[in-house]
Amino acid sequence: MTVTGIIAEFNPFHNGHKYLLETAEGLKIIAMSGNFMQRGEPALIDKWIRSEMALKNGADIVVELPFFVSVQSADYFAQGAIDILCQLGIQQLAFGTENVIDYQKLIKVYEKKSEQMTAYLSTLEDTFSYPQKTQKMWEIFAGVKFSGQTPNHILGLSYAKASAGKHIQLCPIKRQGAAYHSKDKNHLLASASAIRQHLNDWDFISHSVPNAGLLINNPHMSWDHYFSFLKYQILNHSDLTSIFQVNDELASRIKKAIKVSQNIDHLVDTVATKRYTKARVRRILTYILVNAKEPTLPKGIHILGFTSKGQAHLKKLKKSRPLITRIGAETWDEMTQKADSIYQLGHQDIPEQSFGRIPIIIKNERLN
């Protein structure tokens, strides 16, 4: 049986994600962000609820990306996720994209020219953000064209780069429905942005989200729930440069901006520059929130849930892979577990996110 990996956030899970799972082949393993997202935001609903939604709509296994993989720039996010999926035996990687191109060809380009491409990046001025630099790199070395807002396409390029030397088949699937950032409700396949914007519209949510009750009946989290914690961390921290990726310039800008900022958007707008993108600033503010310092990654893979078919695959891997199905006295990943504890502080109804939790199990009627 073909084993297909999918890297996702499911923030939240919606009909477009269901379409991706239905279109992908074989047994589907999801490497999913935990309770904080790649762009530096708390998850709308917790990782366990999102895992359950995925497993009820086509996923066979859901594993958790550690904090220092989840909350990273596209290249590090892709590299960390693909490394985990390769340990779980994937043969191909499926992903949605605005532009279906020959990503397999791009793997070969990077395998042949990685040194030149990396050297080229270092020649570009620091006035360009890292995403702008990587786009220029792909334009020069592979003739890739960029038009408008295509975050999934850009992430696809990171997947190609991270897949070099790994013998993975990339399977791009054309993104259907609304654009990534669209807030338009007039789509059967509405975007996650639109769903987050219109959470109070039950009719819209029920048509846009499979198993919508799981979304509606659980706490909805945003930066608003954590801004006071963040403000305290910034004002009381003796040395922000001890936080991951915070340099002297950013520390100074953040310390000044927090004194006049009433919410996260105002703070991000005040700190961001052409060099420091808003997404990068949000990630750094997330690092400050959870007091993240030098990144370390766990050896084990945390299993959030599986179907009967997924369980059969995991049994084959158990002896050769460090699979974590329950976090107890022995920690899995200290940083992720600390981030989970802070996530819980945002709402009294968020249950324990780490200790004692066991995987969600969805029984398949058939194991074909």
Swiss-Prot record:
Coiled-coil regions listed in the entry: none
Domain of life, source organism: Bacteria
GO molecular function, one term: ATP binding
Pfam families per record: HIGH_NTase1
NCBIfam families associated with the record: PRK13670.1
Entry function: Catalyzes the formation of N(4)-acetylcytidine (ac(4)C) at the wobble position of elongator tRNA(Met), using acetate and ATP as substrates. First activates an acetate ion to form acetyladenylate (Ac-AMP) and then transfers the acetyl group to tRNA to form ac(4)C34.
Protein name in the entry: tRNA(Met) cytidine acetate ligase
Native organism: Streptococcus pyogenes serotype M1
Name of the gene this protein is made from: tmcAL
